[in-house]
A protein has these predicted regions:
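Walker B catalytic acidic pair
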Residues: 130
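Predominantly extracellular/secreted Zn2+-dependent metalloproteases
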Residues: 1-124, 134-234
Length: 234
C-alpha cells in the first residue's frame, strides 16, 4: 500500500557539491522500483513472518525502540502491519557525503546503494536504515543501526533484512535477483549515471566470492538451513 514518487529535492546543476541531494535520473528511478519491489516482497515471505514471531531465537537478540524497550510479541506483530500500511514515500538520491537521508515521507539513498543492493551485504543497511527513519525510529533504537548484544551478536533491523535478502536471493525467491537486467553497473550505462562503480562490483566472480562469504556468516541462513520451514516449498 505504499504510494511512491520521485524527486530531486531541490537539486539543480548549480547547487554545488555540498547539497544534500543529487539528480534523480531515470537509471536511479528504475533501481528504486527493483529495491521497493524486492523489499515489499520480502515482507510477504514465510521466512519474514517466522522471524518476526521468533526474532530472538533466529537473530540472537530482540529489536528495541527509541527508548531501548525490547519488542514484545504484540509489538512485532503490530509493526509488521504498520510497515506495510498505506504510506507516501518520496524517493531520491542523496549526496555521497551520506549513506542516505530519511524521515517523514523522504526516503533517499546514496549512489552505491543503487547497484549494491543485489549483493545483499551492500545497500540494504542504508535502504532499511532510512526506511526506519520514515517509520519514526531514531539512532537510539536498533531499527536504524544494529547493536551488539552482551553476547557479542550484532542485532537489528538492518542485519535482519540483508540476511533475509541473501537467503531469498540464493533460493531464487525474489522478484529481481539479476543485476544485469537493468545493468546499472555496466560501462555502457556510465553516461546515464553520475557516479563511478566500486571495484568490488565490477567483476562478477569477485562479487560472488564476497556474497558467498557473507552467506556463510549469516545467522538467518544457518537457522533456516538447519530448521527448514515445513510450508516453504522452494
Amino acid at each position: 500500500q505504499w504510494n511512491c514518487s520521485f524527486s530531486n529535492f531541490g537539486w539543480t546543476p548549480t547547487v554545488g557539491e555540498s547539497y544534500n541531494f543529487r539528480e534523480m535520473r531515470p537509471i536511479y528511478a528504475r533501481e528504486w522500483v527493483v529495491i521497493l519491489t524486492n523489499y515489499a516482497y520480502m515482507m510477504t515471505t514465510p521466512e519474514y513472518k517466522y522471524v518476526m514471531a521468533n526474532f530472538k531465537k533466529v537473530m540472537g537478540g530482540d529489536l528495541y525502540d527509541n527508548e531501548k524497550v525490547p519488542f514484545t510479541a504484540e509489538k512485532y506483530q503490530s509493526e509488521m502491519e504498520r510497515f506495510k500500511a498505506k504510506k507516501n514515500f518520496v524517493l531520491g538520491q542523496t549526496s555521497p557525503a551520506y549513506g542516505g537521508l530519511g524521515g517523514g515521507a523522504t526516503w533517499g539513498i546514496t549512489d552505491w546503494n543503487f547497484y549494491g543492493h543485489y549483493a545483499s551485504f551492500s545497500g540494504w543497511e542504508s535502504i532499511t536504515h532510512e526506511f526506519m527513519h520514515c517509520m519514526d525510529y531514531g539512532h537510539n533504537s536498533n531499527m536504524t543501526y544494529a547493536a551488539k548484544t552482551p553476547e557479542g551478536v550484532n542485532v537489528g533491523w538492518t542485519e535482519f533484512i540483508w540476511q533475509l535478502h541473501i537467503w531469498l536471493s540464493k533460493k531464487g525467491d525474489l522478484p529481481y535477483t539479476d543485476r544485469n537486467l537493468l545493468g546499472f553497473h555496466k560501462p555502457e550505462n556510465a553516461q546515464y549515471r553520475d557516479c563511478d562503480i566500486m571495484q568490488i562490483f565490477q567483476d562478477d566472480a569477485v562479487l560472488q566470492k564476497n556474497i558467498d562469504s557473507f552467506y556463510k556468516k549469516s545467522r538467518l541462513v544457518k537457522y533456516f538451513t538447519e530448521n527448514p520451514l515445513k510450508d516453504n516449498k522452494k
